[in-house]
A protein has these predicted regions:
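NAD(P)H-binding glycine-rich loop region in Rossmannoid oxidoreductase-like domains
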Residues: 50-97, 101, 105-108, 123-125
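Short-chain dehydrogenase/reductase
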Residues: 92, 96, 131, 142-150, ...
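Conserved Rossmann-fold NAD(P)-dependent oxidoreductase catalytic core, especially the SDR/UDP-sugar
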Residues: 97-144
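Active-site Tyr-X1-5-Lys
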Residues: 140-168
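NAD(P)-dependent short-chain dehydrogenase/reductase
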Residues: 160-169, 173-213
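Mid/C-terminal beta-alpha module of Rossmann-like enzyme folds, strongest
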Residues: 214-233
Length: 233
């Protein structure tokens, strides 16, 4: 039986939604979206898998049997004014334990490729002037979110080494566009109110990617390519 289905987590999120839009436009493979609780997809008509929570105890039995590729973009992201007593533990519960639980069950179900949407935060918060991050840099995350993504990457490499499932890890930079939230949205609001921002006095550069093009940066091009011999980046 030929397996050609893509299972996408985080489809209601900003980046996950952009990935879903891209996959629907390409119409190369059937897509099933994973959503939590009563969340709804924005103007998308695809089969949906509903889960109550996403952590190390989530049961995926039967939901991955037809999947050839899992694209995992669901995550606990930056929380403004986080009230968790232990933010790192909260991030680990979803981003590490939830990710590795999904990956192990995906491998056991016969999924051939697992694409993990990580974050440039794994690399750190800044480089020396005139240099850019590379995939070979030593990870230096500086906050709980980045640490959790790094630990998930490390665990996924172990899963790749222990199973026949290929793991692809992508670290997107800041993604912007319609529906963006957090600090980027705050800056847009300040600008709309005419509040000047001191960019001219700051000698700094930061890479950005438009939401409309974030799907390729999240590894979608790897979905349609032949399986490679490398199981981790």
């Amino acid at each position: 039986l030929m397996r050609n289905q893509i299972v996408l987590t985080g489809a209601t999120g900003f980046v996950g939604g952009a990935i879903l839009d891209r996959l629907q436009r390409e119409k190369k493979y059937p897509v099933t979206a994973v959503v939590r609780g009563d969340s709804s997809l924005r103007a998308s008509v695809v089969p949906v898998i509903r889960i109550g929570s996403f952590d190390g105890d989530t049961q995926w039995q039967g939901n991955l049997d037809e999947a050839d590729v899992v694209i995992h973009s669901a995550a606990r992201v930056h929380v403004m004014n986080d009230v968790e007593s232990d933010p790192l533990a909260a991030f680990r519960k979803v981003n590490v334990e939830g990710t590795l639980n999904l990956a192990r069950q995906a491998a056991a179900s016969g999924v051939r490729r697992f694409i993990f949407v990580s974050s440039i935060k794994v690399n750190g918060e800044g480089t020396t002037p005139g240099t850019a991050y590379t995939a070979d840099d030593i990870p230096a995350p500086a906050d709980p979110y980045g640490i959790s993504k790094m630990e998930a990457e490390e665990g996924l490499r172990e899963v790749a080494a222990q199973t026949s499932m290929e793991v692809v890890i992508v670290r997107p930079v800041l993604v912007y566009g319609p529906g963006v939230k957090a600090n980027f949205l705050n800056m847009m609001r300040w600008l709309s109110k005419g509040i000047p921002l001191p960019f001219g006095a700051i000698h700094n550069r930061r890479s950005l990617v438009a939401g409309s093009s974030s799907a390729p940066s999240a590894g979608i091009s790897r979905v349609t390519s032949p399986l490679t011999s490398a199981k981790a980046p």
